[in-house]
Amino acid sequence: MVVIGEKFPEVEVTTTHGKLKLPEHYIESGKWFVLFSHPGDFTPVCTTEFVAFQKRYDQFRELNTELIGLSIDQVFSHIKWVEWIKEKLDVDIEFPIIADDRGELAVKLGMISPYKGNNTVRAVFVVDATGTIRAIIYYPQEVGRNMDEIVRLVKALQTADKGYATPANWPNNDFLNEKVIVPPANNMDARKKRLEACKSGELEGYDWWFCYTDLKE
């Protein structure tokens, strides 16, 4: 089982778009990717999730991020399900879906709960352009995911790469709104400079350890 900060395991997978090598395929194109598992094709909650992901696909692409689904099904099932979604719901699923028919990748990624049978839970892995796992979320099979939160998560992680932290519910925090947090000073000299920056207006803050600013693009 993998954890945040590790490299995504190197695997070759069969998808609805052909064979792909992960994470190599996305590293070579300099892209992040969100890998998400679903319990099974032709199921109601999973269908609503795929439609929701597709409707936000452009938002992910604007963040230089691709989507890739996964379940313990055969590729033929994925193809028929995607066709059904197009025919019945008029939504064209553009991103690939991994056919992990033996469940090998699902086991490696800890997507299967011994208390929930042989299907995957609703896992989400956010992987950056270096192939490093940046975030992992698990949802139970009976609870559909909030795709806007996953978009927000990717934005927040990319903001962290600029040297900032994000407050609760960012960018709609209760008192900081869309502002981002400057990491606390870690020595006395930095503490002094941080206080001076707040006093001069370069930063805003409540104390030397709680400073914030507008996100600079």
UniProtKB/Swiss-Prot annotation:
Record-linked InterPro entries: AhpC/TSA, Peroxiredoxin, Peroxiredoxin_AhpC-typ, Peroxiredoxin_C, Peroxiredoxin_TDXH, PRX_1cys, Thioredoxin-like_sf, Thioredoxin_domain
Residues that, per the record, bind substrate: R122
Alphabetical UniProt keywords: Antioxidant, Cytoplasm, Disulfide bond, Oxidoreductase, Peroxidase, Redox-active center
EC number: 1.11.1.24
Gene Ontology MF terms: thioredoxin peroxidase activity
Subcellular location: Cytoplasm
Annotated active site: C46
Catalytic reaction(s) noted: a hydroperoxide + [thioredoxin]-dithiol = an alcohol + [thioredoxin]-disulfide + H2O
Pfam families assigned to the protein according to its UniProt record, in alphabetical order: 1-cysPrx_C, AhpC-TSA
One GO term (biological process): hydrogen peroxide catabolic process
Family matches, as HAMAP family: Peroxiredoxin
Name of this chain's protein: Peroxiredoxin
UniProt lineage: Archaea, Methanobacteriati, Methanobacteriota, Methanomada group, Methanococci
